[in-house]
Amino acid sequence: MIRTLEIVNFKSHLASKIRLGDLTVLTGVNGCGKTAVTQALLLLRQSFVNNRLMAGLDLNRPLCSIGTGQDALCRWAPNGIISFVIGDGQDEIMKFSFDAENGLDDSFLKKHEEDSSYPDSETLTAHPLFSTGFQYIGASRWGGAVCSRKIHLQSSNNGSCHYRRDRVSLWRIS
């Protein structure tokens, strides 16, 4: 289980260390980095699913889309290296670092060789973030839109959920 997540130079996170529990609720004002916490994990997951994590980070699709390296890099970053460090609360720590400085216009950031401690592929596959049992709950911003159609959340084989119409009603309460 993921117990700590360090995010360095990613979006609004210059250097953040977050302790995670069995249930973690992220709250805060707009723009403080709540979404970026989830996006950090989803970027690692989607790069792994795309068989590209050992080479770098896919910034777009299928789980989330950030844009380019310039969109991902924190505007106050002292250098162009984006890092994510995952800890299990015991001894296992995985550090993933990516070179955003040389990929500002790219949607794929190459692995930063000098500052990463990538586990082997077998260890990655056994980790909850990269296993076939991975699940998460995401939120969409409806922005005050009125939704009168019915939808249904349907799981796909990769652990993500998709909306299917005509099953569940969503109502905007004024």
Q: Which positions does each model-derived feature cover?
A:
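Pre-Walker A-like glycine/lysine-rich segment at the N-terminus of P-loop NTPase domains
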Residues: 1-47
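Phosphate-coordinating catalytic segments in nucleotide- and nucleic-acid-processing enzymes
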Residues: 47-174
